[in-house]
Amino acid sequence: MSRTNFDTLLEAGCHFGHLKRKWNPAMAPYIFMERNGIHIIDLHKTVAKVDEAAEALKQIAKSGKKVLFVATKKQAKQVVAEKAQSVNMPYVIERWPGGMLTNFPTIRKAVKKMATIDKLTNDGTYSNLSKREVLQISRQRAKLDKTLGSIADLTRLPSALFVIDVMKENIAVREANRLGIPVFGIVDTNSDPTNVDFVIPANDDATKSVEVILDACCAAMIEGLEERKAEKIDMEAAGEAPANKGKKKSVKARLDKSDEEAINAAKAAAFIKEDEEA
């Protein structure tokens, strides 16, 4: 049974493409007709493509891997954030940080900096700083959170990208292509589908259109997550839970309180210096 249907997509306006003069010829297989100078997308093909993408996303979620959602256009930002959070997946809805994938270690370093600042806030280090210094560090934390807060849990490269408007997010698509990361995308008639592994031909400018497609895909991912959870419970019940191999022993640093405070103060000073140089 299909995860969506023709009528649902039609009601959401998924069939509306762009003006004929703006079309990309590579989208010809997904165009049903032209009406009043506007291309109309073949929703029967959209239904099939949504099913195909949803099944693949379900398997990714079931395997415990991450899908990074990307949508920086105004119409899609809020709905993408909500849907990504519903399946506990990372997302980017502000400016795409160049090198997000191809220079991932640097991005992770910035995310770790956020965690360090949070630690300084909680352990009392801030009480030894002036109001100006606290403000500088807080400003730096807010700046990092705006662009990277939604990917704080992404400890390794994602297993797939889900992009809304592949033309607007072309840098993200190119980075994923370079690293061999599969790309799922809602592709309108003005975009090039050749760099997208799972093409979902649909209107990428209407919030409702984006929402109904994400509803179907995220429902499949939730199924995958639930199946993964059920399998884990069954394995534990059968006494077949895999042993945690190669588990590293935690090594506690034997520092007295004064040494720890000195290290934290040095970290805070480094953050203040970075803010002044920025």
Swiss-Prot record:
UniProt KW keywords: Ribonucleoprotein, Ribosomal protein
GO cellular component annotations, sorted alphabetically? cytosolic small ribosomal subunit
- PROSITE patterns hit by this protein: RIBOSOMAL_S2_2
Residues covered by region (Disordered): 233-257
Q: Is RNA-binding one of the keywords?
A: no
Q: Name one GO molecular function term.
A: structural constituent of ribosome
Name the Pfam families for this protein. Answer: Ribosomal_S2 (PF00318)
For the biological process aspect of GO, one term held by this record is: translation
Annotated CDD domains: RPS2
Give the UniProt family note: Belongs to the universal ribosomal protein uS2 family.
- Cited NCBIfam families: rpsB_bact
Protein's name according to its UniProt entry: Small ribosomal subunit protein uS2
Q: Which organism is it from?
A: Bacteroides thetaiotaomicron (strain ATCC 29148 / DSM 2079 / JCM 5827 / CCUG 10774 / NCTC 10582 / VPI-5482 / E50)
